[in-house]
């Protein structure tokens, strides 16, 4: 198991030592979807849900989620996040959520971008479940990252 960075020889997990790594500018972009009925999409984008205007609440929840990532994902390093955006795109069958996170640090922000998307998606689900208990969260993935030893990439 020695080739696994977060696992010691005895199989126990540990947080990787990043103290010798150089700080670089890093970004990550992630997306996810909440699938629901067309009438619920209308309610979502016109702020006509029983719980209120879901998208501003989900945006703030996503930003908060990114900031809390090292508190809920055990082996993530705390990072000084310089910018977090959470945006929504209306689709015929739901909403596409995209989060972008930037930092200057020693490790990437992919987990923060994923946490922003999933937290925003969970918030949308929470706020639409009164009108659609069958809504689905899916397609959560990293779209792009920049910086660090592994370089830049995108799907």
Swiss-Prot record:
The UniProt record lists the keyword Nucleotide-binding: no
A GO biological-process term: Mo-molybdopterin cofactor biosynthetic process
Catalytic activity: (8S)-3',8-cyclo-7,8-dihydroguanosine 5'-triphosphate = cyclic pyranopterin phosphate + diphosphate
InterPro entries, A to Z: MoaC, MoaC_bact/euk, MoaC_sf, MoCo_biosynth_MoaA/MoaC, Mopterin_CF_biosynth-C_dom
Binding site for substrate: 75-77, 111-112
Gene Ontology MF terms in the entry: cyclic pyranopterin monophosphate synthase activity
UniProt enzyme class: lyase
Domain of life: Bacteria
Transmembrane segments: none
Pathway given in the UniProt record: Cofactor biosynthesis; molybdopterin biosynthesis
Keywords of the record: Lyase, Molybdenum cofactor biosynthesis
Active-site residues annotated for this sequence: 126
EC number, UniProt record: 4.6.1.17
Disulfide pattern: none
Task of the protein: Catalyzes the conversion of (8S)-3',8-cyclo-7,8-dihydroguanosine 5'-triphosphate to cyclic pyranopterin monophosphate (cPMP).
Protein name: Cyclic pyranopterin monophosphate synthase
Organism: Corynebacterium efficiens (strain DSM 44549 / YS-314 / AJ 12310 / JCM 11189 / NBRC 100395)
Gene name in the database record: moaC
């Amino acid at each position: 198991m020695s080739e696994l960075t977060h696992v010691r020889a005895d199989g126990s997990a540990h947080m990787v030592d990043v103290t010798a790594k150089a700080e670089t500018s890093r970004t990550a972009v992630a997306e996810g979807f909440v699938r629901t009925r067309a009438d619920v999409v209308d309610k979502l984008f016109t702020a006509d849900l029983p719980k209120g205007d879901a998208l501003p609440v989900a945006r703030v929840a996503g930003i908060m989620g990114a900031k809390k990532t090292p508190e809920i994902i055990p082996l993530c390093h705390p990072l000084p996040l310089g910018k977090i955006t959470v945006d929504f795109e209306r689709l015929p069958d739901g909403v596409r959520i995209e989060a972008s996170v930037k930092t200057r640090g020693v490790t990437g922000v992919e987990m923060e971008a994923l946490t922003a998307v999933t937290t925003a998606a969970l918030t949308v689900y929470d706020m639409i479940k009164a009108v659609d208990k069958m809504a689905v969260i899916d397609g959560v993935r990293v779209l792009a990252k920049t910086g660090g030893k592994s370089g830049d990439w995108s799907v």
